């Protein structure tokens, strides 16, 4: 898979350095995966959730941080729409819904 917005990970790590190892590992696994559907993602990351509208939510560092992505399976693109702490994600999810990010 190709992560189109890898810069977002680097910027998030600058503000949350404790996430560096976990986000680098997540990025490495994603880049070396070839997903065709949600079942493929689930085999790679058991804690991922499909929230609709091609959006998927990954829990990072024991659910302390969340990544919301859009995945285009046919062209193997992963587009990061949101990275934040769990409370930030919950606020945003209440306001607009994860499937609208």
Question: Where are the predicted features?
Answer:
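Basic, Lys/Arg-enriched alpha-helical interface segments
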Residues: 1-64, 73-79, 86-101
């Amino acid at each position: 898979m190709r992560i189109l917005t890898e810069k977002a990970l680097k910027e998030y790590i600058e503000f949350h350095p404790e996430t560096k190892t976990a986000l680098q590992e997540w990025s490495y696994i994603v880049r070396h995966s070839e997903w065709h559907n949600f079942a493929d993602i689930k085999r790679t990351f058991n804690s991922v959730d499909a929230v609709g509208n091609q959006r998927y939510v990954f829990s990072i560092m024991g659910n302390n941080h969340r990544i919301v992505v859009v995945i285009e399976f046919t062209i193997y693109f992963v587009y990061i729409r949101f990275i934040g702490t769990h409370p930030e994600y919950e606020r945003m999810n209440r306001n607009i819904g994860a499937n609208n990010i």
